[in-house]
């Protein structure tokens, strides 16, 4: 297959970086719940988790893209057979398909809950909206898909980065107090035995887990992009997207640490135990932001749901 977009283009690089960003982030990232469990819960060691994610995520995506560019797979899922052989590769193909399909319906549930919680809409309306938007985008083909989510993803990351920067500029002096609270388990409003949720027993397992579940999502997606784009455009896009996501994670994580015991408006929950911890950060920036933030979360779900199909 002849590659499209062969000439180097910064515009194309930005779109591809946006696609990487968009696929990696989702409702868990936008709400801040993923960042709490995979990074913030480990305090300063969360930076080591981030280093593990950055290295592994960058490594396998560059190699998936390289394989797609050089092998020109008839089907993107053939990348599993390329790496794992006929039998194991076929198993991985079916497993990843089922995994992505089930992940899509998790996204549908998240979209329905988001619009229901913020705007009081019936659950089925949020579900139908996401399914319809996803179907329309997927029907447009790979290039339309990449262009669509490649524009939305960076907007979400920029907003998250802005929340992180504003919060740290205002509350940076509270980071040490937050680190002490995490280390000593002194969380406001915690019941006996209750503590902050984490994704694994230590920062290493957390980092491998965070990059590992994304591997099943990205393998065929990167292989497909590799057949349609020049290596240089795609490599730069992968690097740029990975850096942008990592910067956003670091900023939001330390913003959460500085506000780990900050309560919501009625004091019933705090950043450490909130379902949507970033909403508390956003409301501290500007109270009416919660209504806008629900749209941001929905957009994050959309950008992750589209490539799953």
Predicted regions and their residues:
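Membrane-interface interhelical connector segments
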Residues: 184-195, 256-287
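Extracellular loop-to-transmembrane helix junctions
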Residues: 8-11, 38-63, 240-250
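Membrane-interface loop-to-helix entry segments
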Residues: 111-115, 122-129, 137-171
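Juxtamembrane transmembrane-helix boundary signature
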Residues: 20, 51-77, 259-262
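Juxtamembrane interface elements at the cytosolic ends of transmembrane helices
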Residues: 26-36, 60-73, 133, 137, ...
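Transmembrane-helix boundary/entry motifs in multi-pass membrane transporters
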Residues: 3-12, 41-47, 70-100, 117-123, ...
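Small-residue-rich segments of transmembrane alpha-helices in multi-pass membrane proteins
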Residues: 19, 49-50, 82-93, 153-168, ...
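Hydrophobic, membrane-embedded alpha-helices of multi-pass small-molecule transporters
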Residues: 10-30, 49, 96-100, 104, ...
């Amino acid at each position: 297959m002849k590659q499209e977009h062969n000439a180097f283009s910064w515009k194309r690089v930005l779109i591809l970086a946006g696609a990487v960003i968009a696929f990696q982030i989702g409702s868990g990232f936008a709400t801040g719940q993923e960042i709490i469990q995979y990074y913030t819960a480990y305090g300063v060691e969360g930076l080591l988790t981030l280093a593990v994610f950055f290295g592994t995520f960058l490594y396998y995506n560059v190699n998936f893209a390289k394989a797609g560019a050089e092998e020109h797979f008839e089907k993107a899922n053939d990348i599993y057979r390329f790496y794992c052989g006929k039998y194991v590769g076929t198993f991985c193909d079916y497993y990843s398909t089922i995994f992505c399909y089930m992940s899509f319906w998790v996204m549908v549930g998240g979209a329905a809950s988001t619009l229901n919680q913020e705007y009081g809409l019936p659950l089925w309306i949020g579900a139908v909206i996401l399914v319809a938007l996803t179907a329309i985008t997927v029907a447009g083909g790979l290039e339309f898909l990449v262009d669509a989510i490649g524009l939305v993803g960076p907007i979400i990351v920029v907003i998250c980065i802005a929340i992180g920067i504003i919060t740290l500029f205002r509350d940076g002096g509270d980071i040490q107090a937050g680190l002490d609270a995490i280390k000593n388990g002194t969380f406001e409003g915690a019941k006996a035995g209750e503590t902050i949720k984490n994704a694994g027993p230590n920062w290493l397992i957390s980092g491998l887990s965070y990059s590992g579940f994304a591997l099943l999502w990205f393998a065929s997606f990167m292989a497909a992009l590799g057949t349609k784009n020049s290596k240089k455009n795609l490599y730069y896009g992968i690097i740029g997207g990975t850096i942008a996501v990592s910067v956003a994670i670091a900023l939001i994580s330390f913003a959460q640490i500085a506000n780990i015991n900050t309560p919501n408006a009625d004091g019933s929950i705090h950043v450490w135990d909130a379902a949507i911890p970033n909403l508390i950060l956003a409301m501290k920036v500007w109270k009416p932001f919660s209504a806008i933030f629900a749209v941001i979360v929905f957009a994050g779900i959309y950008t992750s749901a589209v490539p799953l199909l």
